Amino acid sequence: MIDADGNLVCPPIADPHVHLDAVLVAGLLTRKNQTGTLLEAIDIWGEWREHLTKDLLKTNARKVIDWYIANGVLRVRTHADCTDPTLLTVESLLELKEEVKDLIDLQVVAFPQNGIFTDPMNEKLLRKAIDMGVDAVGGAPHIEYTREDGVKDVELVYDLAEKYDRLVDIHIDETGDPHSRFVEVMAKESINRGMGERSAASHTTAMHNYDNDYAYKLIGNIAKAKMNMIANPFDNAVLQNRRDGYPRRRGITRVDEMSERGINVCIGHDSIMDPWYSMGKGSMLQAAFLLLHMGQLNGASQIQQLFDMITTNSAKTMCLSDYGIKEGNSADLIIYDAQTEEDVIRLQSECTHVIRKGRVICKTQPAKRDLLYSENKWVDFKL
């Protein structure tokens, strides 16, 4: 018996977008990301990938999974770079998925980091990754050499996902370039194939810089397609629009406008101590807190929406059927050291209990701050 003492009990947190193949390598890199840009990070990763071993990858990923569990995150979707000829990352993460299944539910996306049509081998590697058993097919159309190849990138992802009955999760328009408009192709494919609810568009940071008339039309098509949208505030806040000078545009997609149109928007952590982002500890509450500020989402109803973006919205994006506190579902839940969703985000509350399949797998004693200048007085920042 656990006494929650009036505190918030909710389903586990879900992270729909992370790269477990790259976590925790920031301190091992011989070359640092001096410009802080997405493109330099991709170059650094390409150099580092040649030195990556299965043991190191799985050791780092397991450590981050421990962090996730301590933060109440029990559903995770990871991308696996499938442009490495060895497919080491795909093989390692599929093995890890099986090894940690009693602790956490893991989905693996075949992600062509360097594009599909930038190298003759990349399409073959993507197809092989699908044969290996990944859960979703990914793409990166904005990385391709031309607009035409970018369109082909999206179309091939849908062809493969439809043929092999996989989910779709595409890194798309992850740039400040307002001319990068591949999510419109994704919306079209989702509508024509009826695959929107099984599709996720990750990043879409170029939407921030679109002409408003075009963005309004696009958001309508995304809503019609019933697509899922993933914002990644940690990386996008620091990687995008770095050449702007001042005033500097925010690198966050149009979360508020899409939410107002009823589109399912959720939040991903994306990177944890890697070439793209050297910070992070697997806390989705931190990601929600940052998006609250970067996306100007501090309205009363928006704060509740933020909590949904790391729970139910993320679960919907991941197409999870066994999610939520209801009869018949797996007994997975967490208890926070706060009574409301707003206070959980404000306080960045600890999970006092993390429960997996009816078993407590993590307990945390929240910090208590004793004020030594006054007898029997302490602070917990609660009202």
Predicted feature locations:
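Histidine-centered catalytic micro-motifs
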Residues: P11-V23, L167-G176
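Active-site mouth loops of central-metabolism enzymes
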Residues: D43-N60, V109-P120, P141-E148
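Histidine/acidic residue-rich metal-binding segments in metalloenzymes
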Residues: L88-D102, D119-N228, G245-I267, Y323
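Active-site gating loops and adjacent loop-to-helix segments of metal-dependent hydrolytic enzymes
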Residues: L24-L57, G133-A136, F182-A200, A223-N228, ...
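Alpha-helical scaffold segments that flank or form the walls of functional sites
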Residues: A26-H79, L87-E99, L125-D131
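Active-site microenvironment of metallo-dependent hydrolases
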Residues: Q304-L383
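His/Asp/Glu-enriched, well-ordered alpha-helical/loop segment
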Residues: L167, K188-S199, D235-L239, R249-Y336
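Histidine-rich, glycine-flanked metal-binding segment
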Residues: M1-C10
